[in-house]
């Protein structure tokens, strides 16, 4: 622990450990009422189907699946009851044959041949059926060739016994081999955490495999269950949204040999785009995690589920490391599987962080739509001049217009994400700027209109001196070599 603290720093503190306790409890919001979960922590879905009406007959049409889905106590009850009824029914049939033939009468001489030897009451008929069905064959009771009805009943008994054995034993085998118990050795962390990873706000939780046998083709999916109302007024109580845990990159395909931390990057496409530490205290949602894979030993598909409600998501936490390198192998400490520690995390949502970054960056200015926003843009650009962001002296010489209004140049630069110099402005706009009496608002309106026009101008729009210099093209031939290179780079 001390070595880990030296590695991570003293500012990190363990705030949550395994279910056995230890460590400081994670911070909790104000106590709420009991939260109704859609999926329990053990993966059981809290859904009950009612008012089926006549649809219950569909369960009998798929009787085998119905028996497999029953609880164990009902399976055992049906198993014992079916065999008991079958045995009593077949024993009664043998007793009826013996009664109708008169084999139960003991007054027969030695020359009389019964249907079944040594069957003279119901218990003896029941024992004969058990010996035949279980192929015990003691040899004391046996069927004779003088009883054709006994031969037919024997064939019927063999067919019926095979059907009952195949149905009930197969049902019990399928139920015992179901991979539900394999899912109990797949662990999920008790809490999910939200913190920064690789410079991005990320939702994280941990999964682990307690067995040495692998989960083949393990894949994980996440669903966000949240109630919402559509613009048409329809209320959706359990709207399901997909959480991206690496579908495009293949990160959802797991090699689950050691505990893994599953990450969902919160971005503009995430349902948690506007989720902050403050709004999470009032939100109500449930994150359902589904882990699927093929059991290596049986080849059957296994699915493990769990869920995290809003009060089980810790803001500003990170999971404790559980893997250490020993001599020749890696050791996993599952006592720290659920442990988290606090890390510095901004309490704002990703949307709020992007808005603050946009407002704080002077190079990203919105389009000028009204006088208030225009004045704010001009003031922002005035601040840039104060910190020393000016045009290079060579580019100032290119413009050759010292009397051009600086505010107009700034405002025109806000109409596009690309900053233009004086030389990039159209010649009509340059002539307008030199006319006295033009107010700033008129210049702004004309500048906006001119900047929306194509930047390419004809030679007729140039002054006569520039027409002569340009020779029907650009003035690149009269520029110094360095400025000619700069100008060519700008237009490419």
From Swiss-Prot:
Compartments in which it is found: Membrane
One GO-annotated biological process of the protein: regulation of monoatomic ion transmembrane transport
Region (Disordered): 16-35, 452-492
Pfam families (alphabetical): IRK, IRK_C
Activity regulation comment: Heteromultimer composed of KCNJ3/GIRK1 and KCNJ5/GIRK4 is activated by phosphatidylinositol 4,5 biphosphate (PtdIns(4,5)P2).
Catalytic activity, reaction form: K(+)(in) = K(+)(out)
Intramembrane residues: 122-133, 134-140
Cystine pairings recorded for this chain: none
Membrane topology, Cytoplasmic segments: 1-72, 172-492
Superkingdom of source: Eukaryota
Predominant localisation class: membrane
Location of region: Polyphosphoinositide (PIP2)-binding: 174-201
PANTHER family attached to this UniProt entry: G PROTEIN-ACTIVATED INWARD RECTIFIER POTASSIUM CHANNEL 1, INWARD RECTIFIER POTASSIUM CHANNEL
Assigned protein family: Belongs to the inward rectifier-type potassium channel (TC 1.A.2.1) family. KCNJ3 subfamily.
Record note on quaternary structure: Associates with KCNJ5/GIRK4 or KCNJ6/GIRK2 or KCNJ9/GIRK3 to form a G-protein activated heteromultimer pore-forming unit. The resulting inward current is much larger.
Name the record gives this protein: G protein-activated inward rectifier potassium channel 1
Species name: Gallus gallus
């Amino acid at each position: 622990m001390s070595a880990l603290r030296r590695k991570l720093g003293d500012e990190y503190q363990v705030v949550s450990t395994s279910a056995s306790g230890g460590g400081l409890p994670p911070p909790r919001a104000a106590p709420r009422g009991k939260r109704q979960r859609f999926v329990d922590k053990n993966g059981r879905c809290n859904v009950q189907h009612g008012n089926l009406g006549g649809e219950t007959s569909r369960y009998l049409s798929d009787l085998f699946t119905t028996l497999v889905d029953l609880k164990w106590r009902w399976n055992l009850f049906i198993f014992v009851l079916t065999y008991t009824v079958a045995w009593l029914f077949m024993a009664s049939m043998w007793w009826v044959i013996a009664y109708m033939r008169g084999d139960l009468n003991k007054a027969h001489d030695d020359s009389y041949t019964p249907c079944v030897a040594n069957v003279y009451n119901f218990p003896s008929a029941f024992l004969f059926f058990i010996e035949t069905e279980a192929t015990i064959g003691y040899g004391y009771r046996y069927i004779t060739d003088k009883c054709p009805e006994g031969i037919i009943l024997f064939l019927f008994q063999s067919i019926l016994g095979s059907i009952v054995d195949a149905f009930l034993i197969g049902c019990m085998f399928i139920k015992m081999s179901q991979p539900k118990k394999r899912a109990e050795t797949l662990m999920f962390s008790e809490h999910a955490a939200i913190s920064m990873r690789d410079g991005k706000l990320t939702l994280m939780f941990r999964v682990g495999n307690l067995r040495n046998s692998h989960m083949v083709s393990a894949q994980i999916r996440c669903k966000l269950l949240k109630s919402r109302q559509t613009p048409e007024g329809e209320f959706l109580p359990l709207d399901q949204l997909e959480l991206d845990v690496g579908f495009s990159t293949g990160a959802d395909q797991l090699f689950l040999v050691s505990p893994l931390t599953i990450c969902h990057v919160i971005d503009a496409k995430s349902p948690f785009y506007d989720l902050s530490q403050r709004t999470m205290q009032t939100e109500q949602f449930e994150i359902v995690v589904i882990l699927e894979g093929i059991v290596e030993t049986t080849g059957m598909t296994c699915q493990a589920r769990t869920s995290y409600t809003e009060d089980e998501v810790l803001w500003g936490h990170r999971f404790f490391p559980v893997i250490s390198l020993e001599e020749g192998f890696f050791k996993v400490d599952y006592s720290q599987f659920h442990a988290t520690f606090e890390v510095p995390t901004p309490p704002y949502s990703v949307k709020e962080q992007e808005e603050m970054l946009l407002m704080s960056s002077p190079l990203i200015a919105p389009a000028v739509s009204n006088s208030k926003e225009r004045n704010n843009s001009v003031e922002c650009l005035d601040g840039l001049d104060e910190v020393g962001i000016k045009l290079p002296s060579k580019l100032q010489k290119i413009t050759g217009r010292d009397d051009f209004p600086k505010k107009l140049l700034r405002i025109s630069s806000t109409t596009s994400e690309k900053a233009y110099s004086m030389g990039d402005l159209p010649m009509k706009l340059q002539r307008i700027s030199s006319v006295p009496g033009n107010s700033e608002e008129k210049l702004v309106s004309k500048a906006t209109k001119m900047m929306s026009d194509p930047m390419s101008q004809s030679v007729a729009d140039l002054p006569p001196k520039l027409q002569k210099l340009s020779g029907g093209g650009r003035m690149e031939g009269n520029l110094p070599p360095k400025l000619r290179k700069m100008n060519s780079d700008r237009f490419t």
